[in-house]
């Protein structure tokens, strides 16, 4: 999320899918600098003989193009295959942050393939245990501390970039005597994978890229600089009910931003609204379009409820000496709407003109989000980048090896952009994951399991597996009902129209509560309780949800308990008291359905006041 102090910007820019980069100015093209990494070290590293995990270090040049350069140490973990090895996986989890702390997670993702695959993880230089860059007092929210950090590190900092780091990785591979690797890159790890492929094609047997960093025309990594209001339309277009809302999703949201700018609502500050449109959170994706329409029509509660969830949400700290390494990569590898050779004052002028001309955060302005273009919008303004160091040099001859690329609809870069960028690889295959977010193989739910299975299959036989992974497990809502009379009845045989409406309102209330337990949720997954939309309370337990006079439809109070299995099977035993019901009394309702499906309404079965019913799904 973007905040006035940029507290959450690093998490959003490095780890989430809420912004998309716009094309920066084209700069002078760079040629690929050839560096010779010794093909045979004087003697193998001691870890080469290990039969269990071996943590080691290797001395490498600070500047690989200068054999007389000072030496630094890079740290690595080498995990030999449990049985006979058929290959080696070189993995980087992204960031750019230390890699070694994520070794257990990488092992969990790869799991059975490590029986026959060695695993190599190298801490990129400048990070973690690899000659870390440190700047005491560094705060990414304070530009002066970034400038001071750059001055403190001096000219050495220019060599802590992906082009140099992949030479280190190659040196470690050779010191261990490992053959060509399958490079598993996640997030920023895909930038390292591309840099490695360009500089050491002989060392690459295959690559699996998850949540790919896209490079500019000059080969530098694009960082997010544009909002994604198009995603509001993507989720709405998949839903019959949402498509029935008045107007176009994108224009409706622009009207909402303008309304809140002109008439501020303390319960929905624009900073919070910017996060509510993050459709990679399933509850937001399910409700944001309907909530925006309701707000503009005079019903603010659905939108306010979404915004309240963000209060007190944890954010990633962005201060500390160790963030210097992050800055070195982000700025040295990155492409921004200013010239690499410009001084900070010129960069600020260029950045300001870019935002005035392109409005990349539209429908917001930087001021809407508490941001000052000249002070707090881009960390790298005060970081010199005198050395040419493209991640993927234009014209580099890339190896003709299998490359599998997975990309989600809601990731930082769209699947289409990723596919277009990676056409430079002769044998790359893009696999789109509908409604997928970032770091797909690390995710939960069926999509995470599916992508992990695809990764394991690809690493094993280097063929892109058949089958389809998807995270699309909901349909966006239509209009919020303001009375029982507005509720579309469930077509349950044996019940009159009034009772069908009560049944529909009861199910809508239960489904609203269950949606908070979608396996892809982040913010809502942390909730232990929440008020009902129109009153009452919902309490979340371990596999259970308790409704206490919870009202999703005004004056329809629902109490009882919902049981939800890990597989998404929901059963509910409820008591429903609805004003305007046929005889004005409470009804007992039993419900059973499959939650988290891409349907307008799943198939329902159960009893209403003791009478059995079944209703087919509505697709």
Named regions from a protein language model:
Residues 434-499:
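Catalytic active-site module of serine/aspartate enzymes centered on a nucleophile-bearing elbow/loop
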Residues 140, 193, 197-255, 289-319, ...:
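A catalytic-pocket lid/entrance helix-loop region that shapes and gates access to the active site
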Residues 250-398, 464, 475-478, 482-601:
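Alpha/beta-hydrolase fold active-site neighborhood
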Residues 70-146, 409, 420:
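N-terminal cap/lid subdomain of alpha/beta-hydrolase-fold enzymes
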Residues 152-155, 163-180:
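Conserved acidic catalytic loop of the alpha/beta-hydrolase fold
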Residues 412-417:
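Conserved alpha/beta-hydrolase "acid-adjacent" motif
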Residues 1-28:
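Secretory targeting and sorting signals
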Residues 399, 404-407:
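Short beta-strand/loop motif that positions the catalytic acidic residue
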